[in-house]
């Protein structure tokens, strides 16, 4: 970084933003408190840019990437910093907004910070919609649990089939009658909550279909759907959460981004590895582990998988087939060694991530 560059670090919150300005040759930044609206921050930065070159940074947080995009639109360099990778002093027990902004400016000039990838507007919109679906799915699960627990407390058990939440189960729920008005109202409220969540989920699923035609997702989804256990929804989630796979130099770097690499505490002659780090993208890790369960079965090209692979690039199809053979063999070897199924599937998901990266970067 040039010695003549002015560093501006922001500690951004909903109402106020602290700006730490570190001028060339100075060791202590000047601190300014601003309102968090973009026009105010832009005017502040433009005033400093008239004097010399500036570079900005701030921690990734709930305020998102709007400030970065507003600065980039005016040709002002701005990095969004990964909070988990900011160096911390073990004995530092004082934390304030002004202190955080000042430390961020000093560390940024020393090039001791790690910037994160900024998704495009389309990638962020797709990611938000997919995460919205996850939230609705969790709401539906909670609503169903509340209804099931209410019925169980009052001795109401569905025994017509072994599966719940089918049409027959819905008819059985509607046929329930209660001796007291309060119980009747409770039952209706719980059923209505389930129906509303189902309706919201179906509406979002319709919106997700439109994403399959919006660039740059279709090309990525086409390659991802060549793999066993990955259909439209899973492929969309991976494509949106991962972004452009070419930004990762190696397959292990993608595995680390998903939090699927093992933790390690080694020193000298001692080598100790522990559970996976879980420090990466939890949404991506979840769908990868779900897809990895499919590789406990023998390698096979079923009709649905053949349909998904139709028209896909031949290199992606070839990588997907090699993944099937390799990952099933890996599953069986680990199972023969007596490993727990959850550990096996996690290991398979880690290797599956490498195959997906290879298919996306061909």
Which role does the model predict for each range below?
Residues 1-362:
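A detector of single, family-specific signature residues
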């Amino acid at each position: 970084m040039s010695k003549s560059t002015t560093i501006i670090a922001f500690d951004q919150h909903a109402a106020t933003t602290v700006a730490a300005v570190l001028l060339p040759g100075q060791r202590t930044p000047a601190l300014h408190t601003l309102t968090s609206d973009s026009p105010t921050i832009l005017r502040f930065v433009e005033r400093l840019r008239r004097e010399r070159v500036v570079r900005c940074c701030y921690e990734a947080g709930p305020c998102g990437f709007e400030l970065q995009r507003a600065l980039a639109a005016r040709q002002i360099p701005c990095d969004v910093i990964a909070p988990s990778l900011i160096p911390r002093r073990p004995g530092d027990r004082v934390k304030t907004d002004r202190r955080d902004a000042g430390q961020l400016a000093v560390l940024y000039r020393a090039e001791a910070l790690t910037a994160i990838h900024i998704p495009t507007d389309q990638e962020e919109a797709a990611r938000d919609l997919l995460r919205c679906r996850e939230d609705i799915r969790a709401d539906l699960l909670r609503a169903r649990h509340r209804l099931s627990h209410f019925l169980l407390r009052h001795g109401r058990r569905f025994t017509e089939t072994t599966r719940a939440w089918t049409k027959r189960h819905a008819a059985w729920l509607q046929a329930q009658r209660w001796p007291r008005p309060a119980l009747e109202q409770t039952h209706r409220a719980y059923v209505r909550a389930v129906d509303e969540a189902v309706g919201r989920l179906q509406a979002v699923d319709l919106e997700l279909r439109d994403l399959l035609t919006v660039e740059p997702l279709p090309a990525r989804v086409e390659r991802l759907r060549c793999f066993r256990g990955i259909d439209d929804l899973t492929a969309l989630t991976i494509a949106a959460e991962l972004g452009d796979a070419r930004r990762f130099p190696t397959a292990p770097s993608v595995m680390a981004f998903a939090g699927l690499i093992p933790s390690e505490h080694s020193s000298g002659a001692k080598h100790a590895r522990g559970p996976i780090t879980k420090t990466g993208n939890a949404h991506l890790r979840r769908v990868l582990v779900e897809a990895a369960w499919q590789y406990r079965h023998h390698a096979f090209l079923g009709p649905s998988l053949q349909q998904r692979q139709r028209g896909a690039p031949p290199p992606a199809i070839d990588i997907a087939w090699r993944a099937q053979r390799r990952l099933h063999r890996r599953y069986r070897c680990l199972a023969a060694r007596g490993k727990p199924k959850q550990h096996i599937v996690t290991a398979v998901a880690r290797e599956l991530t490498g195959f997906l990266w290879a298919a996306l970067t061909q």
